[in-house]
Amino acid sequence: MISLKLALVCLAQLMQTTFTHSDSTAPYTGPTHDTSELTAAVGLPRLRDDQPARPFPQHSPYRAGTILPDHISQEVMDDSVRSFYQAWKEHYIRVGCGPDEAYVWFEGTKGTNICVSEGQGYGMMIVALMAGYDPNAQATYDALYHFYKSHPATTSPHLMAWTQTKDCQSIDGGTATDGDMDIAYSLLLADAQWGKHSSIPYREEALEMINAIRHQEVNPDTYIVMESNGWTKRSLDYFDMRSSDFMPDHLRAFRRASGDTFWDTAVVNNYRVFRYLQDTYSPEAGLVPDFIRQIHVTTPQQSYFPATAGDGPGDIPETTAVEKISAVPAQPHYLESPYDGKYNFNACRVPWRIAADYLLSGDPQAAAFLAKLNPWIRSTTKGNPDNISAGYNLAGEDLPHRYFEALCFICPFAVAATASPDNQQWLNKLWDYIVHFQRKDFDYYDNSIKMINMIILSGNYWAP
């Protein structure tokens, strides 16, 4: 089998004559790397003999009673995903910093950062899910993996430092939990796709990473997902979380892979926090804030039963104990912006994460969360996707000066709409609205969320 390093070199040499795309823009002007290599692994002949076990398109069976866009054919949806994937990969996958490495370019920053672990996680999931359509998916995935391994956190070689600069150095050894969780999930996807045909032990690496996440990025007292590896019991932020770091389908996958019932309780307790916030602070809209503080939650005795056949134990909880829970939205400027306690650029991902869990597991906790959210967003927009604002307070009112399109807000509402047939016309409108934008219309964050959400909306997302 050809080495990854040689494959990337050959691909870079061939790029200029084998792939063009009408949606290209001026090349990135990074410090040391020939960025013409960014399209090196796109659209070229296969360099590996092995085929993925679950090639795109998968048309995965989702939970009974959920919906997909029904005004266009499956073939048209799949083609839309393929087309946008080509544009996304060409623009965002960059070869560097080492000869066998690639990263997801953190476009749009005015600073010196070229990559964040959040984007690396997005990219590794996307590439693994698009294997089969992309003949070079495994080579690309492995290059992304090597970049992640070359930039570890200071506390663990299995977690990724949260950001890297143009000189290919990590700013510090801290982590971002969402990036680590997506990378770990992608390793399980990679194992399902190519596990028997790789020099990288994807499953073993996933298990090491899952264990590191468990011990460094989840609060052992409350089972709540923390913001990073930087919080200890002495930290003021020890009982805080970023709402978008709760990815219940990932936690279920970690449970299946590791056999650790810790993840069962983590799913239950994080859902309980979300339910409390909806009921207490957003009873009309069903929103949660970017950051949640002072979380205190008991851990009642629970029993579990499988969500679907073959998913294994521990997917859906039954709880009989009296709940004791408290939490508050973060104050302004808690960490990032005046809107840290609002539904802003972090929490906008929550509908996607919860809906993805419902599509795969059918958990009634996810259904209950979405049952509040979906009627509100349809009503407040009058059924017009163009009226979705780029941010809301928890009462469901638009944040000031946010009347512009932001796919990071729009796409997750589309995934949320899949939860019920009541949303069918709304979902159809959202699909059409999303796909009419080109890659050049938005930056890394919006486009990467759009890419993952299109995979889900077309019925091509699955659990490893």
Question: Language model features by range: what are they?
Answer:
Residues 70-122, 127-172:
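Internal amphipathic alpha-helical repeat/solenoid segments
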Residues 113-120, 170-194:
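Aromatic-rich carbohydrate-recognition surfaces in CAZymes
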Residues 432-440:
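Solenoid-like repeat scaffolds
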Residues 139-150, 185-189, 204-214:
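Active-site-adjacent structural elements in enzyme catalytic domains
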Residues 38-84, 113-117, 157-158, 172-178, ...:
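Extended ligand-binding clefts on enzyme/binding-domain cores
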Residues 124-132, 182-195, 249-253, 352-359, ...:
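Short glycine/serine- and small hydrophobic-enriched flexible loop segments
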Residues 19-51:
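Intrinsically disordered, low-structural-confidence terminal and linker regions
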Residues 5-16:
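Bacterial N-terminal signal peptides
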